[in-house]
């Protein structure tokens, strides 16, 4: 299985930190957010990765290179300007191949065994989404779970972690495109499975949340 890490966003709410670095390179617990993902994916047996980039993307490429220093192979998908989630996936489809692939937001942090993600069967679904308890900054939630399927009713928050069939995006035109409208189309057809994440999830969307997680990880390491 291949995995795609989304790393093209500007990170406006993280300025001024993201004036100098792309958000996935911001460090928590002594290493960049994106490196936490890469190491956990490798531990789960996923060694072929696709990473998209736009804002300060050259710094991601300079830092991670071809991935060999981390024991993985990285294929880069450069975007002239950020294409949103679905647009980024559509552009990267030739790099992702014909098998189901995992997608993870590069500006999140997960404390769980990534094998639970990699070993998830898709069955007849076009997508499988991992949901999380609603964080304080998003109390309403996004979607709900109903008999193993995700439905368009606010209850839990979409973690950004998903498993997808390439066919779900095949034939869609190139260009900027959000993922949520596609997900809702598939949900209406009963084609989106889901479950709750079996571990901790953090959306690192502000400087304060980055600092809070970094301090927490440093305390754990003592």
Indicate residue ranges for each PLM-predicted region:
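Active-site metal-binding loops of divalent metal-dependent hydrolases
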Residues: 10, 106-108
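Short beta-strand-to-loop element that shapes/binds the nucleotide-sugar donor at the catalytic cleft/hinge
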Residues: 55, 128-142
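Catalytic-core segments of class I nucleotidyltransferases/pyrophosphorylases
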Residues: 46, 102, 109, 115-122, ...
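Conserved beta-strand segments of alpha/beta enzyme cores
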Residues: 24, 73-75, 126, 191-193
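Short catalytic helix/loop segments, enriched in acidic residues and glycine
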Residues: 20-35
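Conserved N-terminal catalytic core of the sugar/cofactor nucleotidyltransferase
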Residues: 2-5, 31-105, 145, 171-174, ...
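N-terminal nucleotide-binding beta1-loop-alpha1 segment
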Residues: 1-19, 42
């Amino acid at each position: 299985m291949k995995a795609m890490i989304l790393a093209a966003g500007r990170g406006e709410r993280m300025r001024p930190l993201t004036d100098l670095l792309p958000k996935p390179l911001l460090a928590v617990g002594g290493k960049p957010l994106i490196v936490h993902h890469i190491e956990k994916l490798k531990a789960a047996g996923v060694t072929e990765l696709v990473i998209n980039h736009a804002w300060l993307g050259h710094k991601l490429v300079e830092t991670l290179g071809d991935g060999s220093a981390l024991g993985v192979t990285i294929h880069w998908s450069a975007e002239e300007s950020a294409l949103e989630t679905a647009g980024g996936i559509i552009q990267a489809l030739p790099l992702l191949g014909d098998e189901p692939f995992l997608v993870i937001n590069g500006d999140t942090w997960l404390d769980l065994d990534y094998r639970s993600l990699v070993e998830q069967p898709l069955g007849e679904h076009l997508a499988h989404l991992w949901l999380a308890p609603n964080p304080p900054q998003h109390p309403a939630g996004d979607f709900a779970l109903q008999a193993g399927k995700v439905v368009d009713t606010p209850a839990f928050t979409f973690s950004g972690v998903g498993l997808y069939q390439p066919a779900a995006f095949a034939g869609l035109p190139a260009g900027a495109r959000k993922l949520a409208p596609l997900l809702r189309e598939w949900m209406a057809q009963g084609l989106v499975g889901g479950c709750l994440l079996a571990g901790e999830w953090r959306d690192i969307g502000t400087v304060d949340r980055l600092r809070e997680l970094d301090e927490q990880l440093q305390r754990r390491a003592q």
